[in-house]
Amino acid sequence: MMGAVQLPVETEACLHDDAASRPISDSNTVRVAVLRQHQYHSSVTYHRLDDNRLIPGVVGYSYLRDIADEGKKQSPSKQHARVIQAYSKIHSLLSPPREPGPIDSETKTREKKSSPVIVHDKRCAFIERLEPPPNSKADIVNTVFAQVNLRTPVGPPLDQFVNCRSSNIKINDLKDSANGLCRPITISTGICLFSSRLLGFIPTNGLSTTDGATETVIPPLPYSADATFYELETCARMAMTIAGLAVTAGTGGTAGSRPIVVRLDVPCLQYYCYPLELLQAGLVSWKYVQEWFRLVDRRHRQVAGLLKDTITHEVLRRGGDIQVEVTAGTIAATQLLRLSVFDRMELPSVDDILFVLKWVGPYQAAWREFLDILDDCQRPKDLRSVALMAYVFEVMYPALHQIATKSLHGNGEKSGRPLLIQVDDIAEWRIFDHAEKLLKRFKERQHGFYPLLVGVFPSPRIFTSEDQGRSTLFLHDPGLKILQTRSPSSNSEEGSCVVRPLDIIGQIYGREVQDTLGQLTRKHGLSAADGPESD
């Protein structure tokens, strides 16, 4: 929606024409970008944060340079301390044990070069304060993202703001890791497709209306070939967070390294639901649904490839090594739906969907275990609830698979509790919460088998300016051409220029990340560099 205003010409020089956009050498200064929606265009400003202050123009977000201890249980200082403690525990679980025997000077030198060093800035954090909706009785929710500095053996350092959940890590788990007890480690992460602006609806919601009207939204088919700002920023942020965890685990060939598998949950089934609901309501044709399926399948392959390659690159350039795979736990359901839409022209029931999940394909045993631990009130009643429950299934899958294949008892060798790490946007905390509750039931059903589940939720440093609610690029997509201005209040073309999402990512996360994403978007057919913006 930018045709109503003539934007300035894009130039490389304008990316560095003011102090706010120059690289920062002071490690105590944090740089953020703030995106704003105007009537006919979007704009971005950069801000240096070096003292306690609200993030300019972002409602409910602040930066604390020096958190004072207020003594209250839910104060920012106490929450910050809990986050740092949780991250330290996760680091201890991942850190390779020392080799047994005497430690000479050569061993000390080798360990110093091969072991990453965690430095916690114990007083810096982002604070997210979410106000409840008007007339709601809900409480204000404060979330603390503590600053964590990670120096890796090779490659650039990692500077992140994270919120962590680790309630079920026990002292014995930390002792086991210190003593060298091996445990399987799996990292799960995910990403949505497109953005709600491009889709015209929110995938997790059902049939919706526009601004309270009674007319159901029928979205245009998502033909855009360009990666959205949300997709690019999520790939960058998740990749760097996972790189820190993977290198901490010593997967670069150091003694005592443990195998790490990274599982990417890129949705497909979840994006089939909305057009099928429109079809059932008699609002769209079979041809519309068929084309929608084709476009979603293509985007799934492209974004999965982009995220996989970005993570692999960030890990390898810091001396790590991981195995990355794309989840496919709902393959039996998606195959049935494709067959029904393209060949049979008849939609399966939810019972048909659950049947193929339980009895068809390589994931059937894990699905039987998963569905067996659900209460009757939790069992999916329609396709949308199956799709939403699949997010939880994928986080739990490594444990479900271990139980289903009886590898829990294996060859008799002692093994530590499996470690499952969910790395995701904080908006997906409900997936973690649901998975954690379901995993507790394993203790009763599986003779005490209780996998370790921890959550690491990195905060973005590219914020959207909204009246209320969480800052999110998925819901508030600024488009692919953005006006860079000198000040938040500026709505003038004077002294401004047009930048793209990758330019902003480069300013916040680094030129290397920008260049890598640029190459990978071209590789996977998601490049926005050579074509006009797709509205």
UniProtKB/Swiss-Prot annotation:
Motif Conserved DDXXE motif is found at 424-428
Q: Name one GO molecular function term.
A: ligase activity
Catalytic function, reaction form: L-tryptophyl-tRNA(Trp) + L-arginyl-tRNA(Arg) = cyclo(L-arginyl-L-tryptophyl) + tRNA(Trp) + tRNA(Arg) + H(+)
Q: Its annotated pathway?
A: Secondary metabolite biosynthesis
For this UniProt record, give its keywords in alphabetical order, as a comma-separated list: Ligase
Which domain of life, per UniProt? Eukaryota
Specify the taxonomic lineage: Eukaryota, Fungi, Dikarya, Ascomycota, Pezizomycotina
Q: Give the stretches traversing the membrane.
A: none
Which residue intervals are annotated with compositional bias (Basic and acidic residues) in the record? 105-114
Q: Which family does it belong to?
A: Belongs to the arginine-containing cyclodipeptide synthase family.
**What ranges does the record give for the region Disordered, renumbered to this chain?**
93-114
The protein's Enzyme Commission number: 6.3.2.-
Q: Can you name this protein?
A: Arginine-containing cyclodipeptide synthase anoA
Question: What is the enzyme's main class?
Answer: ligase
Q: What does this protein do?
A: Arginine-containing cyclodipeptide synthase; part of the cluster that mediates the biosynthesis of a highly modified cyclo-arginine-tryptophan dipeptide (cRW). Within the pathway, AnoA acts as the scaffold-generating enzyme and is responsible for formation of the cyclo-Arg-Trp diketopiperazine (cRW) from L-arginyl-tRNA(Arg) + L-tryptophanyl-tRNA(Trp). Additional enzymes from the cluster then further modify the cyclo-Arg-Asp diketopiperazine (cRW) scaffold.
In the record's own words, the domains note is: The conserved DDXXE motif is essential for catalytic activity.
